[in-house]
Amino acid sequence: MGIFSIANQHIRFAVKLATAIVLALFVGFHFQLETPRWAVLTAAIVAAGPAFAAGGEPYSGAIRYRGFLRIIGTFIGCIAGLVIIIAMIRAPLLMILVCCIWAGFCTWISSLVRIENSYAWGLAGYTALIIVITIQPEPLLTPQFAVERCSEIVIGIVCAIMADLLFSPRSIKQEVDRELESLLVAQYQLMQLCIKHGDGEVVDKAWGDLVRRTTALQGMRSNLNMESSRWARANRRLKAINTLSLTLITQSCETYLIQNTRPELITDTFREFFDTPVETAQDVHKQLKRLRRVIAWTGERETPVTIYSWVAAATRYQLLKRGVISNTKINATEEEILQGEPEVKVESAERHHAMVNFWRTTLSCILGTLFWLWTGWTSGSGAMVMIAVVTSLAMRLPNPRMVAIDFIYGTLAALPLGLLYFLVIIPNTQQSMLLLCISLAVLGFFLGIEVQKRRLGSMGALASTINIIVLDNPMTFHFSQFLDSALGQIVGCVLAFTVILLVRDKSRDRTGRVLLNQFVSAAVSAMTTNVARRKENHLPALYQQLFLLMNKFPGDLPKFRLALTMIIAHQRLRDAPIPINEDLSAFHRQMRRTADHVISARSDDKRRRYFGQLLEELEIYQEKLRIWQAPPQVTEPVHRLAGMLHKYQHALTDS
């Protein structure tokens, strides 16, 4: 496909984006808004953002959800801006500096919350800065400006949503149904690989792919939940399926690890059974029916616990899968499965990374302020706004540098494109609203196609072009003002990019170590006799951390294996019949405190000391288990955990 070719699947969204822009433009001028540009810009960003992220037309609900987040972020930013102005109106420089810190604070929060919700906090940060900078000539008009800005943004969001509904957005439901079928087959094939106990790298690749696919299915569940309330039952089932899928991965990998030391546990009966190849979900269904009969015949005691648990989880998965596909009423059996253990939320391992993002945003905004005050440039304020926008939005993404480059390319492309509209097209459409709408629709259509291709600079070009062409009421054509705005955007993006390069993010290794220590803490916390604590579902949180580890350290198999081993240890110890007595309970609390100290230690020396203390406590704990005559189901997992921690103590403690 050529660089300028138009694929059929890209046309519908391009028309949708053009419609959103035209609607916002028409409504903005019809209601005599002072700056309809904000409504048009909002409609374009809300519609195009999800398409750029998805690499195609976004699924139903994505644009509505992004619009909802934009409204929340705008209102938070407007309120913060008003509070800052009221408190510091007599000290303008201090007011701007506090706004820079506010933008950094919002970026810090957006780095810690869920990626889906971080957009609202990023927006809140630079909205306050925009308000404070814009009202500098006339501070008494602050409330009016804040209200107008909120109104224009809400109009833009409503127009984007109307355009989305008008062109029947894609439903993700069919994709979810297909993935559920395919995922079950992949789970069965992983168990086959683990029982064969073949090449470790093949197994690593298989379970790594399944972790990614399960995480992707969880993202599809979020999209389905946003799409319509009629999928509420399917959403509940999919939430439980996420845990079941992770359980299947864990049991399969434990089956593989068990055979490293005790291959005789997997009998020839099960080896022969899992030799049968499967291609479809129907094949898996037949095999599971046969497998349940084999287990009933051999007995639970003669069946390896990992295979028994795997079959139970796969059976529940099948039952819930049928419910998701049909979206029927939840029956009593399903309700029993759905009334599972409460999920545990873990503390973010990226606090240092979030602090780096705070300083990047704050310093870049302060640098923009100094540049503005030093040069006295009329478009210094525009440069500051772009600095805040780039840093606030770039910091929450995995590769901030590439986002900044995208904005630089976009603002550079916007200069000639905006020049064409400013000098030729818009002046010649002054007498006709229809011609003005058509001209902007053409812009939205072609940039909408490029956005779906994820062309570098396409998203920045769309926003920057709309921002610099004259869409005010009334329209005024001052070339110097246009040139200042265009150059201000470019300078702001370059300054933001410079700060991102200078303030290096070296938090990757620290984040990896914190993640590994959180896995250790989770395994240690599973050693408890507290009934409520044993019922807590840590599995989704643990695999979410594993997924983050896989993204931070692609290809680092030793780290992945260590993390997976800790997850397996957690699951095994969680179900182990630990003797109930006060002596062991007190020691469990002591070990949990020590594990928490390992995570929170600021220096390597403290971390090594606490880790050594944890290893000593595990030795004492094993002796206590022997004294209290704990069964092998308890002593063996604890012994394996202690051995793993001894083996990898340097990786878990050194920076």
Curated annotation (Swiss-Prot):
Q: Name one GO cellular component term.
A: plasma membrane
Disulfide links within the chain: none
* Record-linked Pfam families: FUSC
Q: Does the keyword RNA-binding apply?
A: no
Q: What upregulates it?
A: Positively coregulated with aaeA and aaeX by AaeR.
Q: Which molecular function terms from Gene Ontology are attached?
A: transmembrane transporter activity
InterPro entries, alphabetized:
PHBA_efflux_AaeB/fusaric-R (IPR006726), PHBA_efflux_pump_AaeB (IPR023706)
- Places the protein is found: Cell inner membrane
Keyword Cell inner membrane appears in the UniProt entry: yes
Q: Which keywords label this protein?
A: Cell inner membrane, Cell membrane, Membrane, Transmembrane, Transmembrane helix, Transport
What are the GO BP annotations of this UniProt entry?
A: carboxylic acid transport
Its membrane topology: Multi-pass membrane protein
Transmembrane intervals:
13-33, 38-58, 69-89, 93-113, 121-141, 152-172, 370-390, 407-427, 431-451, 459-479, 482-502
Q: Which PANTHER family match?
A: MULTIDRUG RESISTANCE PROTEIN MDTO, P-HYDROXYBENZOIC ACID EFFLUX PUMP SUBUNIT-RELATED
Q: What does this protein do?
A: Forms an efflux pump with AaeA. Could function as a metabolic relief valve, allowing to eliminate certain compounds when they accumulate to high levels in the cell.
Q: Which family does it belong to?
A: Belongs to the aromatic acid exporter ArAE (TC 2.A.85) family.
Protein name as it appears in the record: p-hydroxybenzoic acid efflux pump subunit AaeB
- Organism expressing this protein natively: Escherichia coli O81 (strain ED1a)
- Recall the taxonomic lineage recorded for the source organism: Bacteria, Pseudomonadati, Pseudomonadota, Gammaproteobacteria, Enterobacterales
